[in-house]
């Protein structure tokens, strides 16, 4: 059971909200979160790097000069890895880096990572109505009132993206906007401050506690 203060648009405390997310045991928490993080970063790799071996490089079928009598080092092909323009020894080939992790484990890692950031979590009431039109300056000022300085890396978690909020947020350099049902371990751990709306918190409990 975790308790957090709820703030309004002006940055004033207007109440408390209690939520419960099942997390990993203390002895295994770091391990499972680390596994989820490694999986996410590894699966993001394209795996498309490719080089040609001496067998795949065009040309080089003819021996460039005779074996003996020239005074030069012997050579069998102009596509030897020792030659400029030759094949690559043990170079990269396209491969699949995907790591598998059970869905239950992934969700457990997400919940554990989220709860581990409780000290940096800022819970706010819905504020889309406070922005009558897209205004980045107003949103930056709100973050400052909530205790999240614009210079720090901020993760803003919303249940949905109202147009005024999205347009106001997209030009803030260190801000990342994410939907409550699209959480990932890297963003949760990478942010300095995590700002969550009350409806987004309810969505997180609904989606990830199952």
From Swiss-Prot:
Biological-process GO terms, alphabetical: translation
Bias kind Polar residues: ranges: 41-52
InterPro entries, alphabetized: Ribosomal_uL4, Ribosomal_uL4-like, Ribosomal_uL4_dom_sf
Biased composition (Basic residues): 60-71
SUPFAM superfamilies reported in the protein's UniProt record: Ribosomal protein L4
One GO CC term on file: ribosome
Disordered: annotated segments: 41-71
Family to which the UniProt record says this protein belongs: Belongs to the universal ribosomal protein uL4 family.
Subunit structure: Part of the 50S ribosomal subunit.
Main function: One of the primary rRNA binding proteins, this protein initially binds near the 5'-end of the 23S rRNA. It is important during the early stages of 50S assembly. It makes multiple contacts with different domains of the 23S rRNA in the assembled 50S subunit and ribosome.
Protein name, entry field: Large ribosomal subunit protein uL4
Organism expressing this protein natively: Nostoc sp. (strain PCC 7120 / SAG 25.82 / UTEX 2576)
